[in-house]
Amino acid sequence: MIDSATLTYAPFVDSRGKHNPDFTTGQSGKLLIGTDANGKKYLIKHCYPHNAANEFVGCWLAKKLDIPAPNAFLLSPNKAFQSRFAVAIEFLDLKPFDKKAVSHPDDLIAQFVLAALIAQEDRIQLKVVDNHIVSFDFSESFCISKLDLILGLIRQHTSFAQDCAVGILRQQLSAFQKSLTRVKFNHPAFAQAYNLDCEEMCKTATAISKRVLRIAENEIRFMSEELEKLFPMEISVYYEECIFAMQEHIKSFQ
């Protein structure tokens, strides 16, 4: 976790809106740019709690699977934020991605695998950094919604409210587990769109997905402990169970 007091903040201006009067901000709400004492910049998502949790865990998982992605850090609460829950995402020098000239097809396939595993709901956003294809924006993932409601129930500290919160989390975990059963890597249309051999793409995607099995339980617990610096234990357990569900499902892959 980063101490939010060590950063200075300014509004983030999306370049896509400069020449498009109809452009609107995404589901994450208004963003900030955070800058540390050394000049390092971060994109700050601070409006909704599920954004912070999903971005942190999504980037953590990408790193564990050796998939190019920015680093992400939870932030301590700050009056500059619209909620108590914020995440600092490494601000990268992104270059446009040209699907007609894919120099690192394994990177592209890896991003497709990551999006499938985390049940990413938004369109996959691809850019290029240091000649590698990176993905970003994992805010709508892991089948977790209603997090404001869940956190509100947990804060009530009554057995009824706790049971309601856990019940909602169990429903969402069930939805995530079902999403894993729909994961498949034999997509001829995707392969054709990016000039990939479908059979080779499927083999590569399967091999990348099996990297999930390398993640040790103590590494998952470390991720969970980071979450617990900001979120209640019930939320960290949810993400632990998501990773365990991935591992259990991937074991069945040939």
Residue ranges and their predicted role:
Residues 2, 63, 87-92, 124, ...:
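Generic low-polarity alpha-helical segments
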Residues 3-96, 111-121:
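Conserved ATP-binding subdomain of kinase catalytic cores across diverse folds
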Residues 44, 72, 99, 146, ...:
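Short acidic, gly/pro-rich beta-turn/loop elements at beta-sheet edges
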Residues 46-50, 101-105, 160-161, 231:
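Conserved aromatic-histidine-acidic binding/catalytic patches
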Residues 63-65, 105-108, 153-157:
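Short, low-complexity, polar/charged sequence segments that are solvent-exposed and flexible
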Residues 79-81, 123-126, 169-176:
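Low-complexity, flexible helical/coil segments
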Residues 95-149:
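Conserved kinase catalytic-core segment
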Residues 132-254:
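C-terminal catalytic region of ATP-dependent kinase domains
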